[in-house]
Amino acid sequence: MIIYATEVETINSFVRLESLNEVYGLVWIFVPIFSLVLGIITGVLVIVWLERQISAGIQQRIGPEYAGPLGILQALADGTKLLFKEDLRPSRGNTPLFSIGPSIAVISILLSYSVIPFSNHLVLADLNIGIFLWIAISSIAPIGLLMSGYGSNNKYSFLGGLRAAAQSISYEIPLTLCVLSISLLSNSLSTVDIVEAQSKYGFWGWNLWRQPIGFIIFLISSLAECERLPFDLPEAEEELIAGYQTEYSGIKFGLFYVASYLNLLISALFVTILYLGGWNISIPYISILEVFKRNPVFGTTIGIFITLAKTYLVLVISIATRWTLPRLRMDQLLNLGWKFLLPISLGNLLLTTSFQLLSL
């Protein structure tokens, strides 16, 4: 069999083309992921700076001002300091559980960002069960906290881990029932479909007006899931020193703070998507879809800006709540979840189902 030079060149060019396609495929996989992670890190740094400035304003003090202009680099300086601190481990603790606990908490929350639509179809994974994927993944984080508390071999850490697990279970159910009500109104579990269902009717089509009870329950439950005041029982300083974080130092201690702010940001994003219309601007006579059709790049940028503006508005409310309400006792926390929020959210789901059946 004789192979001519032209055939050899054709085969070589085909092999090179296949190799280039594989390289481009890998690039298109990693570039969106890298961009999302970079955006998340920036968002967390902004939240830390915003919380410190709002807290300083409420307490009538100055706040951070030396690290960068207006103290904007203070969070970066604190993270660098924790990075170089010694990583201490309890001598009689369970080292594998102690080491892997913070990583599980952070990774489980990071995976939830894959179903967040920041603009019109600007989402890493547009899944048909996107909203349920978030609920399933977010329920893994308390397991990491419980592992950290148990692996520390410290009574305060163990009690903090148990409190975190009990609190998560108590408020996960009302939150899930509120999400079910939203999915019934939108006839979908996709986060993109939920936003588009709200855009059909403009400002008054937001689920905030169609589900006001669900919005309040979802907001309270998300604050409890984030362990923010008045729901910070797992790390109550007066009772448990620092809860499940007591024995941690260095970068592992910093990972818990990162997980806390990541959880706060993801909760605010889901409030925006489920109840505040997502990327829709909802101004009369101005349709964001028309902007997308005329200039997709400009429309996508505007959509991201609108989503983040609504998200940070929700974050300001969460931060202000921290310095407004006192901490609940553990029995009050569980009673609120099981005796009030759960029955009300179940009744809200039944009412939503009834209205949807009557409208058929």
Swiss-Prot record:
Record's subunit section: NDH is composed of at least 16 different subunits, 5 of which are encoded in the nucleus.
Function: NDH shuttles electrons from NAD(P)H:plastoquinone, via FMN and iron-sulfur (Fe-S) centers, to quinones in the photosynthetic chain and possibly in a chloroplast respiratory chain. The immediate electron acceptor for the enzyme in this species is believed to be plastoquinone. Couples the redox reaction to proton translocation, and thus conserves the redox energy in a proton gradient.
Protein name: NAD(P)H-quinone oxidoreductase subunit 1, chloroplastic
GO biological process: aerobic respiration; photosynthesis, light reaction
Sequence similarity: Belongs to the complex I subunit 1 family.
One GO cellular component, as annotated: chloroplast thylakoid membrane
Localization per record: Plastid, Chloroplast thylakoid membrane
Signal peptide: none
Lineage top rank: taxon: Eukaryota
Catalysed reactions, as listed in the record: a plastoquinone + NADH + (n+1) H(+)(in) = a plastoquinol + NAD(+) + n H(+)(out); a plastoquinone + NADPH + (n+1) H(+)(in) = a plastoquinol + NADP(+) + n H(+)(out)
GO molecular function: NADH dehydrogenase activity; oxidoreductase activity, acting on NAD(P)H, quinone or similar compound as acceptor; quinone binding
Main location: plastid
Gene: ndhA
Statement: the UniProt record of this protein carries the keyword Transmembrane: yes
Enzyme class: translocase
A Pfam family annotated for this UniProt entry: NADHdh
Recorded topology in the membrane: Multi-pass membrane protein
Record-annotated membrane-spanning stretches: 27-47, 98-118, 129-149, 165-185, 203-223, 253-273, 297-317, 340-360
Keywords: Chloroplast, Membrane, NAD, NADP, Plastid, Plastoquinone, Quinone, Thylakoid, Translocase, Transmembrane, Transmembrane helix
EC code: 7.1.1.-
